[in-house]
A protein has these predicted regions:
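Basic nucleic-acid-binding interfaces
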Residues: 1-136
Length: 136
């Protein structure tokens, strides 16, 4: 059997905060993006484009056939909540579960454009600086 493996697997993943509470501020958004990057490194997932909004996260990813996206999402959500909680305990709480849809390679640019346009689509959900120090 050959050692050659080729694959083109892409997905759009989303998850949101508990009860869609807009608890992700600008500092927390940095922590969430960092957590997603850490989860990618640990699981072998690659992010093409992402958007972190006040109440949900949108990464467009590529992954190997032996990768379970549930492991990536679980790790990203867990690490993000832990990092944000280091600053202010209990500020970000994720809802259970996530949504994922696979993307054909020909639709990849459309999916990444959709994610890139999230701030225009939801200007009210752009993570803002906290108004009160230490509070999200």
């Amino acid at each position: 059997m050959s050692g050659h493996h080729a694959y083109q697997m892409y997905a759009h993943v989303t998850w949101h905060t508990w009860k869609r509470v807009g608890c992700v501020d600008a500092a927390a958004a940095i922590d969430v993006r960092s957590a997603v990057a850490s989860a990618c490194q640990a699981t072998g997932v690659r992010v093409f484009r992402d958007a972190v909004l006040a109440n949900h996260v949108h990464p467009v990813v590529s992954f190997r056939p032996d990768i379970r996206l549930s492991d990536f999402v679980r790790l990203a959500k867990s690490v993000a909540a832990t990092r944000v909680s280091r600053r202010v305990t209990g500020t970000v709480r994720w809802a259970r579960g996530y949504f994922v849809t696979t993307i054909h390679k020909r639709d990849l640019s459309r999916a990444t454009r959709y994610v890139a346009d999230q701030f225009q689509r939801h200007p009210d959900l752009i993570p803002r600086n906290s108004r009160r120090p230490g509070m999200l």
